[in-house]
C-alpha cells in the first residue's frame, strides 16, 4: 500500500511540474505577442518628424522601414556581409 501512495505522489508531482511548464510557455508566448503588437505602435518617430515601420510590420513605397531595416514584404533586419 505504501508503494501505491509513493507512485501516486510521484505521478501528481510530475503532473504539477508539467502544468507549471505549460503555464510558463503560455506566459512567454503572451509576453512576446504583447511586445510585438500591444506595446509597440506601428509608427515610431524618426528624425525630421517622419515615421518609420518597425520590424515585422508590412512596408511599401509609402511606409518605409526604420533605420537598420530593409523592406521585404515586411521590415526585416538588414544583414551585411
From Swiss-Prot:
Stored SUPFAM superfamilies: omega toxin-like
Summary of the tissues where the protein is detected: Expressed by the venom gland.
Main location: secreted
Signal peptide coordinates: 1-19
Propeptide segment residues: 20-50
Subcellular location: Secreted
GO molecular function, one term: sodium channel regulator activity
GO cellular component terms given for this protein: extracellular region
Keywords tagged on the record: Calcium channel impairing toxin, Disulfide bond, Ion channel impairing toxin, Knottin, Neurotoxin, Potassium channel impairing toxin, Secreted, Signal, Toxin, Voltage-gated calcium channel impairing toxin, Voltage-gated potassium channel impairing toxin, Voltage-gated sodium channel impairing toxin
Disulfide bridges in this chain: 52-66, 59-71, 65-75
Domain notes: The presence of a 'disulfide through disulfide knot' structurally defines this protein as a knottin.
Function per UniProt: Inhibits sodium channels Nav1.1/SCN1A (IC(50)=5.7 uM), Nav1.2/SCN2A (IC(50)=12 uM), Nav1.4/SCN4A (IC(50)=4 uM), Nav1.6/SCN8A (IC(50)=6.6 uM), Nav1.7/SCN9A (IC(50)=13.6-1030 nM), potassium channels Kv11.1/KCNH2 (IC(50)=4.7 uM), as well as high-voltage-gated calcium channels Cav1.2/CACNA1C (IC(50)= nM). Also blocks mechanosensitive ion channels (also named stretch-activated channels or SACs) and the hypotonic cell swelling induced calcium increase associated with the activation of such channels. It can thus be useful in treating cardiac ventricular disturbances.
Similarity section: Belongs to the neurotoxin 30 (phrixotoxin) family.
Misc: Negative results: does not have effect on sodium channels Nav1.3/SCN3A (IC(50)=24 uM) and Nav1.5/SCN5A (IC(50)>40 uM), and potassium channels Kv1.1/KCNA1, Kv1.4/KCNA4, Kv11.2/KCNH6 and Kv11.3/KCNH7 (IC(50)>200 uM).
UniProt-recorded name of the protein: Kappa-theraphotoxin-Gr2c
Amino acid at each position: 500500500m505504501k508503494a501505491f501512495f509513493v507512485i501516486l505522489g510521484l505521478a501528481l508531482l510530475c503532473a504539477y511540474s508539467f502544468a507549471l511548464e505549460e503555464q510558463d510557455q503560455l506566459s512567454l508566448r503572451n509576453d512576446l505577442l504583447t511586445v510585438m503588437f500591444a506595446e509597440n505602435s506601428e509608427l515610431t518617430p524618426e528624425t525630421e518628424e517622419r515615421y518609420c515601420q518597425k520590424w515585422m510590420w508590412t512596408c511599401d513605397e509609402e511606409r518605409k522601414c526604420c533605420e537598420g531595416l530593409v523592406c521585404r514584404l515586411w521590415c526585416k533586419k538588414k544583414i551585411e556581409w
